[in-house]
Amino acid sequence: HILLSIHRNMMNTCGGVASICRVDKKTGGMSYCGVGNITTRLFKPESVRLVSRDGVLGHEICRPLIKEIQLKRGDIVMMYSDGVVDHFEVKEFPHFYGLASIDIAKISVERFRKSHDDASCVVAKVIYD
């Protein structure tokens, strides 16, 4: 419902993209939904890409789909715009899992930003059991 509301409110604009994650601390479940060229990745021992639906908020979108994934302590959720290259891997970050969320976001934008585009990145670490 949130993405559909954003879509309606962005009509008559240049449009945009968005991803939303909701975490249930009791179950460790994360609900994810995204529209447009925005990347959401879950870093566990391996990297998992969560796929957004095609479209541009405010213009034309496919009906958003909610996906569920299980989180564990130490997992890292990263969401970034298309101004950051999509194909980097954890091995390119020394001490990746030991870094603070803000440092992971900062390094991601500094190292993997496309020179011709704006870039944004949000990182959250799972710290509960």
Residue map of PLM features:
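Amphipathic coiled-coil/heptad-repeat helices and related helical stalk/stem segments
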Residues: 2, 63-64, 105
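Short, low-complexity, polar/charged sequence segments that are solvent-exposed and flexible
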Residues: 39-41, 51-53, 69-70, 97-100
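Conserved hydrophobic/aromatic beta-strand scaffold that supports enzyme active sites
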Residues: 20, 68, 121-123
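Short, flexible, glycine/charge-rich loop motifs used to bind or transfer phosphoryl groups or to couple energy/partner
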Residues: 9, 66-68, 110-112
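Acidic loop->beta-strand submotif enriched in PP2C/PPM serine/threonine phosphatases
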Residues: 15-18, 49-89
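A residue-level structural signature of the nucleotidyltransferase/glycosyltransferase Rossmann-like core
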Residues: 31-32, 49, 76, 121
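C-terminal catalytic subdomain
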Residues: 73, 78-79, 83-129
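Catalytic core of PPM/PP2C metal-dependent serine/threonine phosphatase domains
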Residues: 1-45, 113-116
